[in-house]
């Protein structure tokens, strides 16, 4: 606009000043080696104005051309972006429908032209993995890494998840370790870490992140309690298998107080000690639990079960403690505590006392365990009450036969139903 105004003003000045200098304008002489050019000043001014007009027109044409090129480029780019967005949405729908091959094609085809190319490549990798194409999944992840960088949290989470789906536990373990260094409190990272550590039985690593898992809110109280129990029991097995009983007990004594005071975990430790024939240590821990529980706290069924397995050289202290509790036990605990007491009497060959407590055990038919009747008949026989032993043995056989009769009856009912259905289909 300014240039056009400049040209118009120049022409206007020429038109106004022309008559005043008419006849006095003189001339201009331009001399070169081979040529001489002479013209009036007016002609020179007109030539200068025309030259400027040509230059300005050329500049305008070039600018216009480049503007058209940029507009064309933007138009094609917008078209590709809109197409990529449309294909991404269609691909996500196909992914939800389970058509992973179509989803991968739609999401990954124009991924680089989408609004978030890294997300598209990650989703394409997940779709490829779902249909079992590990090569394509890894290729998409490599492209996503090139775009986002090697330390991108989103890409690394997707890589770890896909490694887990490929069942490459060592690689997934290494990847999740790196993720925990990048984002230790990230919920998705913690969720992956829990799953990978459980599947790879890396209980020590899982134990280190339990506090963060508890604070993350990933699990409710019951689920987290179950996770902690699995972790701690896994640690017991790990230490027992790697370092033996001595290493297990040394590790146990080094644990924090809240863990050593965990009754359920201590019962699990007793079970492992008995499995390894360390009945003395198991008896000592059992005695500690009973002393800590006191007289008014009920004994759990798992603890009673482990007491029946104990075979220490001297069980007198434990026996006195359980005898004291058995005198004031309620009906719910009657069967459990008498069973434990009876087995301790049997270990000491005190069959008369064992017979008395086993009478209390078989008086609770709803709480009987599989071997209770067999053990009771053995005790009664050793105590000299052969009639009662035979009666209990007959009841045991009847219960076994009753259980065996239930299975054929259910099988016959199914056979009759199938045959009836077959006859109906033939009649049709």
Swiss-Prot record:
GO terms for biological process: heme metabolic process; porphyrin-containing compound biosynthetic process. Its main location: membrane. Keywords: Cell inner membrane, Cell membrane, Membrane, Porphyrin biosynthesis, Transmembrane, Transmembrane helix. Pathway: Porphyrin-containing compound metabolism; protoheme biosynthesis. It holds the Pfam family HemY_N. GO terms for cellular component: plasma membrane. The keyword Chaperone does not apply. Gene3D superfamilies: Tetratricopeptide repeat domain (1.25.40.10). The chain crosses the membrane at residues 4-24, 36-56. InterPro entries: Heme_biosyn_assoc_TPR_pro, HemY_N, TPR-like_helical_dom_sf. It comes from the Bacteria. Residues 408-428 are annotated as: Disordered. It is found in: Cell inner membrane. It is a multi-pass membrane protein. Involved in a late step of protoheme IX synthesis. This is Protein HemY homolog. It comes from Haemophilus influenzae (strain ATCC 51907 / DSM 11121 / KW20 / Rd). The lineage of its organism: Bacteria, Pseudomonadati, Pseudomonadota, Gammaproteobacteria, Pasteurellales. The gene is hemY.
């Amino acid at each position: 606009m300014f240039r056009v105004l400049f040209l118009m003003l120049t022409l206007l000045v020429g038109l106004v000043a022309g008559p005043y200098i008419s006849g006095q304008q003189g001339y201009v002489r331009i001399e070169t080696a081979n040529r001489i050019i002479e013209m009036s000043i007016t002609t020179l001014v007109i030539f200068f104005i025309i030259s400027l007009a040509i230059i300005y027109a050329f500049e305008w044409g070039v600018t216009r051309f480049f503007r058209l090129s940029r507009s064309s480029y933007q138009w094609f780019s917008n078209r590709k972006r809109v197409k990529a967005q449309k294909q991404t949405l269609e691909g996500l729908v196909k992914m939800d429908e389970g058509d992973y091959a179509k989803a991968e094609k739609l999401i990954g085809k124009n991924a680089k032209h989408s609004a978030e190319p890294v997300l598209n490549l990650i989703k394409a990798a997940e779709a490829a993995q779902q249909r079992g194409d590990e090569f394509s999944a890894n290729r998409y992840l490599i492209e996503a890494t090139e775009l986002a960088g090697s330390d991108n949290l989103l890409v690394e989470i997707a890589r770890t998840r896909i490694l887990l789906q490929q069942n490459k536990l060592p690689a997934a373990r290494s990847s999740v370790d790196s993720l925990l260094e990048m984002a230790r409190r990230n919920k998705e990272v913690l969720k992956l870490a829990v799953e990978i550590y459980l599947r790879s039985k890396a209980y020590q690593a899982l134990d280190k992140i339990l506090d963060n898992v508890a604070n993350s809110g990933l699990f409710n109280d019951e689920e987290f309690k179950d996770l902690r129990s699995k972790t701690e029991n896994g640690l017991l097995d790990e230490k027992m298998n790697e370092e033996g009983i001595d290493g297990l007990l040394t590790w146990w004594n080094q644990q924090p107080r809240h863990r050593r005071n965990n009754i359920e975990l201590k019962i699990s430790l007793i079970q492992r000690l008995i499995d390894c024939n360390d009945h003395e240590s198991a008896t000592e821990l059992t005695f500690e639990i009973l002393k800590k529980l006191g007289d008014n706290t009920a004994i759990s069924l798992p603890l009673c079960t482990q007491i029946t397995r104990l075979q220490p050289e001297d069980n007198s202290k434990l026996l006195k403690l359980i005898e004291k509790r058995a005198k004031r036990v309620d009906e719910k605990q009657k069967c459990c505590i008498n069973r434990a007491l009876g087995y301790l009497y049997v270990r000491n060959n005190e069959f008369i006392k064992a017979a008395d407590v086993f009478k209390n055990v078989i008086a609770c038919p709803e709480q009987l365990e599989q071997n209770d009747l067999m053990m009771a008949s053995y005790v009664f026989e050793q105590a000299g009450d052969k009639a009662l032993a035979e009666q209990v043995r007959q009841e045991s056989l009847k219960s076994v036969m009753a259980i065996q009769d239930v299975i054929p009856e259910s099988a016959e009912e199914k056979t009759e139903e199938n045959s009836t259905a077959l006859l109906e289909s033939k009649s049709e």
